[in-house]
């Protein structure tokens, strides 16, 4: 019965792991719902501020904010939003693949790259992969604040204003739904003012103190809000990916337990049959 004992011990070990993955799945579900609420709360602001910038740009067409001026691209910056923890499937791996692909295109064109990394997994990746990381922040927690991001974002904005980078993009996972998280590379600046549907009505607005000053203030807020929205959405995507990963692990553990239980039953049956055969053989000899 030595084999049966080993199998029984393995079954007990897998059941213990299954309890852990099941608990982690339930925790991820709870955290995902909270993250979805934060994402839904911040999304209207992030979307609306871009519309307001479009209005302001059209209100003062002769003024072009530095963040709206296209120039020759010699160096680009990326704000890379990753997770602090693992056990979330291929979430970070898929994000890094999309980023590396975009970086390769820039490098083929002779464009240099600077990186601002959010999350421990991103920092660990670039320590191995290599890259010019000029700013990094991690351990934002389950409820990130925009104030925690301002310092790192300012490093990239100052680099753009001083001409050290010519384009800034944010790289993060978009939360499509519970089953789908999509890695995206989205250009932040220079921002191209897109005509808004409301502008077709030629409505007039009064701006105090004036459109130029408002635009100067809003452009920085716009970039900060977009990075914050990326962090919040990435958090929701992380929890969804972790929930799915832990559910798959729990289900796989159940399948493995069933297979081992069958093997255990066969081993036990074989041992009992062997014992009966030995008893019958001994009785016949007597």
Curated annotation (Swiss-Prot):
GO terms for biological process: proton motive force-driven plasma membrane ATP synthesis. This is ATP synthase gamma chain. Belongs to the ATPase gamma chain family. Produces ATP from ADP in the presence of a proton gradient across the membrane. The gamma chain is believed to be important in regulating ATPase activity and the flow of protons through the CF(0) complex. InterPro entries: ATP_synth_F1_ATPase_gsu (IPR035968), ATP_synth_F1_gsu (IPR000131), ATP_synth_F1_gsu_CS (IPR023632). HAMAP family: ATP_synth_gamma_bact. The gene is atpG. The keyword Cell membrane applies. It is a peripheral membrane protein. F-type ATPases have 2 components, CF(1) - the catalytic core - and CF(0) - the membrane proton channel. CF(1) has five subunits: alpha(3), beta(3), gamma(1), delta(1), epsilon(1). CF(0) has three main subunits: a, b and c. GO terms for cellular component: plasma membrane; proton-transporting ATP synthase complex. It is found in: Cell inner membrane. It comes from Pseudomonas fluorescens (strain SBW25). Keywords: ATP synthesis, Cell inner membrane, Cell membrane, CF(1), Hydrogen ion transport, Ion transport, Membrane, Transport. GO terms for molecular function: ATP binding; proton-transporting ATP synthase activity, rotational mechanism.
């Amino acid at each position: 019965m030595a084999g049966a004992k080993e199998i029984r011990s393995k079954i007990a070990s897998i059941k213990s792991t299954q309890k852990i993955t099941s608990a982690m799945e339930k925790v991820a579900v709870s955290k995902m719902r909270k993250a979805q609420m934060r994402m839904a709360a911040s999304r209207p602001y992030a979307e609306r501020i871009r519309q307001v910038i479009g209005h302001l740009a059209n209100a003062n067409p002769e003024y072009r904010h530095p963040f709206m001026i296209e120039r020759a691209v010699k160096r680009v910056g990326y704000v890379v939003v990753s997770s602090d923890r693992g056990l979330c499937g291929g979430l970070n791996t898929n994000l890094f693949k999309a980023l590396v692909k975009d970086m390769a295109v820039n490098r083929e064109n002779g464009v240099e790259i600077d990186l601002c990394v959010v999350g421990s997994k991103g920092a660990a990746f670039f320590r191995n992969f290599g890259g010019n990381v000029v700013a990094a922040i991690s351990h934002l927690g389950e409820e990130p604040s925009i104030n925690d991001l301002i310092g790192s974002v300012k490093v990239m904005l100052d680099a753009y204003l001083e001409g050290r980078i010519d384009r800034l993009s944010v790289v993060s996972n978009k939360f499509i739904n519970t089953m789908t998280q999509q890695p995206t590379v989205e250009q932040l600046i220079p921002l191209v003012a897109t005509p808004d549907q409301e502008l077709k009505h030629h409505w007039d607005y009064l701006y105090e103190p004036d459109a130029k000053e408002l635009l100067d203030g809003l452009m920085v807020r716009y970039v900060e809000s977009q990075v914050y929205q990326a962090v919040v959405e990435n958090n929701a995507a992380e929890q969804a990916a972790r929930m799915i990963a832990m559910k798959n692990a729990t289900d796989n553990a159940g399948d493995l337990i069933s297979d081992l239980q069958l093997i255990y039953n066969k081993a036990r049956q074989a041992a009992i049959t062997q014992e009966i055969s030995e008893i019958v053989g001994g009785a016949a000899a007597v």
